[in-house]
Amino acid sequence: MIREGDKVVLVDPRGKRYLITVSKRDFHTDLGILKLEEIIGRNFGEAIKSHKGHEFKILRPRIVDYLDKMKRGPQIVHPKDAALIVAYAGISPGDFIVEAGVGSGALTLFLANIVGPEGRVVSYEIREDFAKLAWENIKWAGFDDRVTIKLKDIYEGIEEENVDHVILDLPQPERVVEHAAKALKPGGFFVAYTPCSNQVMRLHEKLREFKDYFMKPRTINVLVFDQEVKKECMRPRTTALVHTGYITFARRI
């Protein structure tokens, strides 16, 4: 049963989504005004109508909704890349993650959702404005119970020990390799997201210096092509989300 203060997703007849907090107020859309207090006491999957008679379905928010509707600042790590990081590093509930380059907090939200309330994410960020924006998004999504943001430079060292994963979105991830080697548990993953190939080459060169600490690194990227499906034809859409960044994985031994 939905209560006042809960977050819900409202979906209009066109498929447009609204992520709102349930309260005793009116919510204005181009399809009419919704009285949000009518949601209180209902269940997910039910619907309410606007004053113009349009029906809005009530859904439980998922992480994709928070990522779509969060406040944006610097460029985010896209869900396609975040999902790859989670899959290839084997990130699981209860894991302890050190992250750096928090930006708007998109990857932080994704990781916090995966590790769950028993896990922990510590995020290093050197810019106070980015840290403030990310923390607003983290609190809004309800993950402030498992995330800590440090206004510190990870290039100077990692304070945490026995870490499951070190995940970076930084210009010079090679500067963190030595720190990560000390902080990671055996079997943990060092992961770096980098937009440019020269960054990857510098990182691989540094990892070769630490071959006694890390398994042979692997670098991949992923391209996403949405398909346009019609009655008589299916073809890729004319726009596609192609290169966003390279992701390098190196496992601690």
Swiss-Prot record:
UniProt xrefs under CDD domains: AdoMet_MTases
Q: What does the annotation give as the result of altering C196S?
A: Decreases stability of TrmI at extreme temperatures
Q: What is the lineage of its organism?
A: Archaea, Methanobacteriati, Methanobacteriota, Thermococci, Thermococcales
Protein name as it appears in the record: tRNA (adenine(57)-N(1)/adenine(58)-N(1))-methyltransferase TrmI
Q: What does this protein do?
A: Catalyzes the S-adenosyl-L-methionine-dependent formation of N(1)-methyladenosine at position(s) 57 (m1A57) and 58 (m1A58) in the T-loop of some tRNAs. Methylates the first adenine of an AA sequence.
Write out the entry's keywords from A to Z.
Disulfide bond, Methyltransferase, S-adenosyl-L-methionine, Transferase, tRNA processing
Q: Which family does it belong to?
A: Belongs to the class I-like SAM-binding methyltransferase superfamily. TRM61 family.
Q: Which organism is it from?
A: Pyrococcus abyssi (strain GE5 / Orsay)
Please state the Enzyme Commission number of this protein.
2.1.1.219
